[in-house]
Every structure is written in structure tokens, then in C-alpha cells.
Amino acid sequence: MSHRDTLFSAPIASLGDWTFDERVAEVFPDMIQRSVPGYSNIISMIGMLAERFVQPNTQVYDLGCSLGAATLSVRRNISHPDCRIIAIDNSPAMVERCRRHIDAYKAPTPVEVIEGDIRDVTIENASLVILNFTIQFLEPGDRQAILNKVYQGLNPGGALVLSEKFSFEDAHVGELLFNMHHDFKRANGYSELEISQKRSMLENVMLTDSVETHKARLRQAGFEHAELWFQCFNFGSLVAVKAGEQA
């Protein structure tokens, strides 16, 4: 059961860096719905993208799966024989709850939930890979390498879904969308104190890139086709397709 996010409703004397610990995992569904505009749309559309791209006898990877929302969306929308979903997260608290969520919804497609570092995972025979608000928590120097690995592990015709919070090269646009995102959080019941304290904890661990930077990395990895398919304020999602025909 998800609880309402009140983690930052009272002043915290010493704010450390953000971690996806048990306290965050417990309120995460409420937190992300109230903090990330368009999150539900992205999750449901990932299921539709899975219908289009997932092939029989292949694997789907959900890298940085948190509580498994994207995995469950994929699973609801595919029924291919000999298909498998591999969901990976480095937070023990998230992995434990993700396994519970997966077990609660029975479906024919098997899911393996792994506690581990996505930088160490071997990707192979993939028809779909999901990086849903994950890259922004990696060290900038590690980001190109994970995209290179995804590209190499995708079958021809396979796709990567890359969702992120964005920064903007145009400072005026960046400020407008930043302020609109804060309006969104206020409208969802977060106080100025909650918004400020969470931002302070995230600022050293969540380092955002522009859409242009993401596209440049995807091109460098080898993706011939990459485009923004969804955006709400300073959050959005790209889809990148590896050239070639699906088997």
C-alpha cells in the first residue's frame, strides 16, 4: 500500500543527499504522481510502445525500474511467446517492493527483478529497453557508456525509451518551465518548505541534460532515429530506434 508523501513537511536540520531508501520507497507512487507532470501518460504510453516494438523470443530491460510501473505497463500490453522482462534497480528498498508489485499482478510474461547497478548489466537480444528517469542519477561521465551498451544489446528494429527531467539552453524557457513545474507541485499539495527541502537534497545527485544533449548521445551510440515523443513542462521522453528490420 502506498502512503502520502509527507517526508519533507517539517523542517529537517541537516539535509543530506537524496537516496532511494525505505522511506522514499514507501511513498514513491504518491511522490512521483505529485512531482512529475505527465508521469501517468508516459507509463501508459510505454505499454503502447511495447505493443509495437516487443517481439517473440526477445528480452525487455527496465533499467532503474523503481517500483516496476513501466515493467507492469509493458507486461499488460504484450503476450508474445518466450518473452522475458528484466527489471533492475540498485535500491534494495525499491527492489523489495517492486517484487511485491510484480507478484500481485499475474501475467504470462515472466519478470526477473534484479538488485544491481545498471552499468554492470549485460544487455542482449533486446527488443525494448526502458530508462525511465534513470540517466539523470548517473554520473555524467557514465551516461554515454550505458547508451552505447543499450544500442549494442538491441536487436535491429528495437527501441529505447528514455525519459528524463530536462534542462534548457534557453535560460528564459528554462525559467518558465521550472516555475510551471513548481506551480504543478503546489497545485498537488506540496508546501514551499517541502519543495525547497527536496530540491536541496536532489541538487547534487540529479544532474539534468538538455534534449539536444540526449539526442547527441543517442546519435553517438549509433541510433539512427531519435525524437522527443512526449513533454510536459521540463519533463519528457524520447524514443530511439535501432535501424534494421525486426526478425
Swiss-Prot record:
Entry's EC annotation: 2.1.3.-
Binding site for S-adenosyl-L-methionine: Y39, G64, C65, S66, D89, N90, D117, I118, N132, R199
GO MF term set: carboxyl- or carbamoyltransferase activity; S-adenosyl-L-methionine binding
Gene3D superfamilies, per database record: Vaccinia Virus protein VP39
Keyword vocabulary terms for this entry: S-adenosyl-L-methionine, Transferase
Record bears the keyword Transferase: yes
Biological role stated in the UniProt entry: Catalyzes the conversion of S-adenosyl-L-methionine (SAM) to carboxy-S-adenosyl-L-methionine (Cx-SAM).
Name of this protein: Carboxy-S-adenosyl-L-methionine synthase
Organism name: Klebsiella pneumoniae subsp. pneumoniae (strain ATCC 700721 / MGH 78578)
Lineage, highest ranks first: Bacteria, Pseudomonadati, Pseudomonadota, Gammaproteobacteria, Enterobacterales
